[in-house]
Amino acid sequence: MLKVIEHHSASAGNTFIDCPQMWIIEKIYGFETEENARMRMGHAAEEAAHHALVNQITDEKLIISDAKGKYIERCGKNGGTIDDEYEWTAQIANTFVKELKQYGKLIHYQREYNGPFKDLCLPVVAKTDFEFNDYIVDTKATAKVWRYAPTAAERHKGRKGRINHNYHPKPDHLRQQFLYRELFNKECLLLYASAWDHHTSDLGDHVGHLETLIQAFKSIEHILGIAKTKEDVVRMFPLTFDNWRWRYSPGAEAFARKIWHTAWK
């Protein structure tokens, strides 16, 4: 097998499923996507929520201050207080704290797994978000929680519209959490939060998501098994830029063009 990766992960498997070309430049050629405002928002809100839970902080103003500070720390010279995400981060962190408290005492944060998985040659690595006695909760900061417009009856009762399940839970999130349920032997939940709304999804009766992810891992191993060079892998896929991942990865398109040009010279 071509020795270019050491393990599988849900994030890498999802990238391969969505956009194998992006997987190639990231995992085989080492391209790293710069953290954008949405990514900073998610990381900062999660970190602030963890700090609040561990230290039993419930004062919303303190959580807001901490979340904004963590967002700025991640900005460096790029963006900052002018970003919409700067304000959103603070509200999302508060929502995370309020929702996560209902699950009881936090027993693990970012617990890791690194080990074998049935029928795979390479090990699988995983890292949880918030783990409680009964659940693992993966937090997802988002600009919008997607709902249908409320019906007249819902408006009359002061209720929001129903969740649009085309967006929540997302297939890649389900694939990850089904894998985590298998690895950590515990039920998993997805907590989506925007600055104005939130929604918690369980894995429900969705089927096939774990199998799809494992098949992606097997496909990766098959490709690396028949390829003799990195360029062989590149030549297996045409270079296209129609996947959404390219829009959020500055520099990735130019990097990929050079890789494909070199492989086909």
Regions found by a protein language model. Give the residues of each.
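A structural signal for short, well-ordered beta-strand segments and their strand-loop junctions
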Residues: 108, 131, 135-139, 188-192
